[in-house]
């Protein structure tokens, strides 16, 4: 459930969530989270969303870059993510950022619908 995400991010050390907006209109968001079961040096890129109007503007790349920078500041050396093959453009962007495919999931994210797993050293 997303009902209490603000409280979850606010109360979890080494987590962060960022939103992108223009003229008061929400365009997207992305965050990092030390997902349960991941190694201590690894966080997850989570809740990466863009509105349809924001796609193709480079905003996703900016948000990923910012998340990777903050992850490094927080002391993480790897960033993990889970996605789906249907999100071809997103997967392509992750590959361009240097994320590599994994054969199985890491941690206990609870994302049963995601069947692609990727990781990047930072």
Feature-to-residue mapping (PLM):
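C-terminal "cap" of GNAT-fold acetyltransferases
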Residues: 77-79, 84-122
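Conserved glycine-rich acetyl-CoA-binding loop
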Residues: 25, 38-39, 51-65, 73-74, ...
């Amino acid at each position: 459930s997303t009902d209490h995400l603000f409280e979850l991010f606010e109360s979890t050390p080494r987590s962060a969530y960022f939103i992108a907006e223009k003229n008061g209109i929400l365009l997207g968001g992305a965050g990092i989270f030390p997902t349960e079961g991941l190694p201590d040096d690894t966080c997850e890129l989570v809740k990466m969303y863009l509105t349809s109007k924001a796609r193709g503007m480079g905003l996703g790349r900016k948000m990923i870059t910012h998340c990777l920078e903050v992850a490094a500041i927080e002391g993480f050396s790897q960033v993990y993510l889970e996605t789906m093959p249907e999100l071809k453009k997103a997967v392509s962007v992750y590959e361009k950022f240097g994320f590599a495919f994994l054969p199985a999931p890491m941690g206990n994210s609870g994302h049963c619908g995601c069947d692609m797993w990727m990781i990047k050293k930072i």
